[in-house]
């Protein structure tokens, strides 16, 4: 039987801060007729995030699927998915599928205690929903069904000292978005059909959820968290009464994110979303207490069926010093090897019991080259760092021009690359960093 950890002790001040920020913009908040999704994945600062592509698949009846810790029943058909994930686990921090569904998850602590027993991680639920759901609404159903059947639990970091939390999710497709917030097996969901919304590691659904767990209110009554009088406010009822320091910081980021969206309402573009995710003053682009933004993602989901969805990913830490690279699903897409971490098979510390007793080097090629270029420049002078950043932004501008060409149906130019777009962009970035290393970051004109 899994043991419960009292909510008052999770999270404790001895555990590093864990934070993420998710954003979605729908018309009329978006300038164009698109839905925009964005997420910063804030994780232990040395954790490597890889970009994984998995094609659609067919599976025989009775198949089992091994997730990070447990097995679940496999479905007959799975969709092609693009995942940005911590390299040690099965699931994903954020991702998209071939139908234009995007999902990101966040850590949350509530009055409902977390459990030490291994179950599905929130990141497993992200991937399972992407593989199984052709719409955001169906993804909500997939997650809540799996939550009810298998539960959520297990350590969410590669360390002997466990970090355990429950999850909130932001899910969207080209027509609508959903916020799904959980407290143990209990949950509430909100539907969004216009405007902008953000999440920052706290319950945010108040009254009149779109849907909710059938025992959500009766459980709160039974626990004495709600008296049954007046409107039922999910976030007020299930949130911790005494918030840890990290949750107070989440409130500040949540408010800052709301303000950044409000200031640009009606004019939110891909560039707007990139700038929000790079905002250091608010803490949205974070580096604090052993945690930092280890990967970032922005997706453009056009409402026109004739225009493809485009997903931009960094695959490297700190979006303010990284390059967003576009990906499009297509019949000839393959895994880009330079953003895939090495495999350790049965020797992987995640597969051994007790888990996480040793460490392995999970850095992929792009991560290594990015890290090397930044360190080489830092060892020289500020001018070298500024020169590198200018070169990164120049490369990203080329990537964004490519995106604009594809999104503009009136542009007759043939978008060369298509399925190879992400691969080409990764290759260019690798060449940039190799050149920097060879020149030892000497100051040159861009």
UniProtKB/Swiss-Prot annotation:
Q: Which molecular-function annotations from GO does this UniProt entry contain?
A: cysteine-type exopeptidase activity; dipeptidase activity
Q: Which InterPro entries match?
A: Peptidase_C69
Q: Identify the catalytic residues.
A: 20
**Superkingdom of origin organism:** Eukaryota
Q: Biological process GO terms, please?
A: proteolysis
Q: Which cysteines are joined by disulfide bonds?
A: none
Family classification:
Belongs to the peptidase C69 family. Secernin subfamily.
| Protein's recorded name | Secernin-2
The species is Xenopus tropicalis (Western clawed frog)
- What is the primary gene name for this protein? scrn2
